[in-house]
Structures are given as C-alpha cells and as structure tokens.
Amino acid sequence: MCPLRSLLLISTLVLLHHLPHLSLGRSLPTTTASPGRSCLDYSQNLLRAVSNTLQKARQTLEFYSCTSEEIDHEDITKDKTSTVEACLPLELATNESCLASRETSFITNGRCLASGKTSFMTTLCLRSIYEDLKMYHVEFQAMNAKLLMDPKRQVFLDQNMLAAIAELMQALNFDSETVPQKPSLEELDFYKTKVKLCILLHAFRIRAVTIDRMMSYLSSS
C-alpha cells in the first residue's frame, strides 16, 4: 500500500500546480530554526518572506489589480523546469504498486540532507527547485532595478525576500550557469512594472509553498 505521507504530498503538489488562484492572504505560523539550519528552515523562511512581501504589495498597490482574482496568472518557469513532476515521491514516480526500492544513493554537496546522500530522483527535484529560485531571483532583481527608478518610489522589493532566495540557493549548492540579465529596450512603464510585480509575487508564493511542502517531506523521510 502506498504510504499515506506520499499520497498527501502528491495531492498537495498537484493542487498547487493546477490551482493558481489559491488564496494567498493567510498568515503563516512562525517557526524557529534549529542549530545548523536545514533546507526546510530556509524554505520556511522563504515562504514567510514572500508572503509578507506579497501582502505589502497588495496593500500598497490596491488600485493596481493585485489580488489573485484580478491578475493574469503567469509561470515564468513553464517549459523551463518541471519541479512538480521532478519532486514526485520516488515510490509513486517509479512504480505504480508503490513497492519500488530507493535508487542507489550518492554524495551531494548541498546541505538539504544531513547525510549528504540522496537518490537520483531527489537530486533532480532539488536541482529543479534551484533552477526555479534562480529564475525568480533574476526576474525580481531586474524588476527591482526598474522600481527604484520610479520617481514616486511607491513600492520596491523587500531585501529580506531576495536574501531568503539566495540563502536557499546557497544551501542547495548546485553548480549552474549564470542567467544573463538582458536590459529591456522598451520604454519604462511603471504601471505595467507594478502589475507585473503582483503577477510574479503571486506565482512565486505558490512555488514557495510547493518547495516548502517538498522540503518538509524530504526532512521527514
């Protein structure tokens, strides 16, 4: 019989993947990181940071259609990463009977697993998460540069969120090519930039929930 924990995880991942209109305004419980922080600690910190940033943006940009019901949902990782598929529990991804044994473990450099050993499928999952974080980090940095040019200085990104992304990426510790930031040649439109900020924050919070669920599953496995 399939482990109940695995079934609950896959149900959550599929729900988050197919319901982008999921309510995003709920407050999150405060957690205390244990000594020698794990990727679960970092993912929880990231989820709090992006939730706080989104809440502030919705309050500041209340006249910019910044609620989940009003925005046009967009996934910048579409066709570039496959986190939901890569992060399926191994017993569900490799064998419908859920009796498949774990693949041979090997050494990884990241701090996400205390032993430093993980299966091939888990490594694919963590790498996909890393690639997601990298893409969003680049997008947010480029967008923040535009927002800082706005004479109104109405809204800009919380540095705590950018730091939380960088911390989790560092903990995952995958080698990856640097994503070049291509400067936009179009005329700056601060209204469109602020609407785009809302779209990215909503999408990233959904991805942060998925990442946190996966880290929780891995830490309890």
Curated annotation (Swiss-Prot):
GO terms for MF: cytokine activity; growth factor activity; interleukin-12 receptor binding
Signal peptide, first to last residue: 1-25
GO cellular component, one term: extracellular space
One Pfam family from the record: IL12
Main localization category: secreted
Keyword Glycoprotein: yes
UniProt keyword terms in alphabetical order: Cytokine, Disulfide bond, Glycoprotein, Growth factor, Secreted, Signal
SS bond partners: 39-112, 66-198, 87-125
SUPFAM superfamilies recorded: 4-helical cytokines
Record carries keyword Disulfide bond: yes
Record-annotated membrane-spanning stretches: none
Family statement: Belongs to the IL-6 superfamily.
Subunit and partners: Heterodimer with IL12B; disulfide-linked. This heterodimer is known as interleukin IL-12. Heterodimer with EBI3/IL27B; not disulfide-linked. This heterodimer is known as interleukin IL-35. Interacts with NBR1; this interaction promotes IL-12 secretion.
Purpose: Heterodimerizes with IL12B to form the IL-12 cytokine or with EBI3/IL27B to form the IL-35 cytokine. IL-12 is primarily produced by professional antigen-presenting cells (APCs) such as B-cells and dendritic cells (DCs) as well as macrophages and granulocytes and regulates T-cell and natural killer-cell responses, induces the production of interferon-gamma (IFN-gamma), favors the differentiation of T-helper 1 (Th1) cells and is an important link between innate resistance and adaptive immunity.
This protein's name: Interleukin-12 subunit alpha
Taxonomic lineage: Eukaryota, Metazoa, Chordata, Craniata, Vertebrata
